A protein has these predicted regions:
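Short edge-strand/loop segments of extracellular domains
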Residues: 294
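Short, small/polar-rich motifs associated with maturation and membrane association
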Residues: 1-273, 277-286
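Cationic-aromatic interfacial patches
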Residues: 289
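Outer-membrane beta-barrel translocator/channel fold
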Residues: 297-300
Length: 300
């Protein structure tokens, strides 16, 4: 069964460009949001992040950019109500359908001209009370780590060679490298001495009572970790009968930051409560409440 704009149909009876994934996509991936779990899961659903911050909202389009001006973002509906993918507990998802063709505009009008993403959350199942818990622990690593030149003598030698190669030795070296780092032949000689003899002091005070630093510091390694971790805990309770049913879930997600200095942490709390009560044979009362709190602290 596939969820479409006007209800549900069997996959064999489906007409139109619609793709759907079920809860397995989200149960196998530990991510702070649905959008990150959907990356690469549905054809022609393009999801990009400006950076790696866990709080960063995704840019979503279907089948490429649809508008030069507005960008052509897809309409996101969560249980029939327009919402934000970043605030939904991934473990609450029953299915996600993507409407890609013009039929979405016929149902939702101009707002659905660039496609529609239909998110259906889990509902209660009749029967005895069922309690479910799942948790995960994940390690995150950077895909690319820049290899920086940390040796001052090696860096300055490369700069001198590049300068002389460009000007063919016709122009003298500037007193400031890139208008930031001062240069002098005496400093260059001191860097050469410390490159060959690491036992020499890395910090000294000159005749003007100023500090001079000759340390070789890998600032990328000093500020950023090679790995950071996250852990997630989910619990849900559901049950009911033909007259009343309920589904209540809670989630705690905690991700450590990548900075070595400062207290960087991302925490997300989710609570969802769904219930149905049959008041009369012809009257049913439904409730669907979602509550999300995000606590994100970064040192800068």
């Amino acid at each position: 069964v596939v969820v479409v704009g006007y209800g549900t149909v069997k996959r064999r009876d489906l007409v139109g460009a619609v793709d759907q994934v079920d809860s397995k996509v989200f149960s196998e991936r530990s991510n702070p949001s649905i959008s990150r779990s959907l990356q690469g899961a549905i054809p022609n659903l393009n999801i990009s992040m400006r950076d790696g911050k866990p709080s960063r909202a995704a840019t979503i389009n279907i089948r490429g950019t649809g508008s030069i001006g507005s960008g052509g973002g897809a309409l996101v509906l969560i249980d029939g109500v327009e919402g934000d993918l970043e605030t939904v507990n991934p473990q609450d998802i029953a299915s996600v359908s993507v409407l890609k063709d013009a039929s979405s505009a016929a149902i939702y009008g101009a707002r659905g001209a660039f496609g529609v993403i239909l998110v259906t959350t889990k509902s209660a199942e009749e029967g005895e009370t069922k309690v479910t818990y799942n948790g995960s622990f994940s390690l995150h690593a950077r895909t690319v780590k820049p290899q920086l030149v940390t040796d001052g003598y090696e860096w300055t030698t490369g700069y001198i060679n590049a300068w002389n190669g460009y000007y063919n030795g016709q122009n003298p070296l500037p007193s400031y490298i890139n208008n930031i780092a001062p240069y002098s032949d005496s400093w260059y000689k001191e860097l050469a001495r410390r490159s060959t003899d690491p036992s020499l002091e890395r910090v000294r005070i000159n005749d003007k009572n100023q500090y001079e630093y000759f340390a070789n510091t890998d600032w990328m390694d000093a500020f950023y970790k090679d790995f950071n971790y996250s852990h997630e805990h989910n619990i849900s309770v559901s049950g009911g009968n033909q007259n009343a049913d309920y589904y209540v879930s809670g989630r705690f997600y905690d991700q450590d930051g990548i900075y070595r200095v400062g207290d960087e942490r991302y925490k997300q709390y989710n609570v969802r409560a769904k219930g149905n009560i049959r008041i009369r044979p012809w009257l049913r009362l439904n409730n669907n409440m979602d509550f999300t709190v995000v606590d994100y602290h970064q040192p800068m």
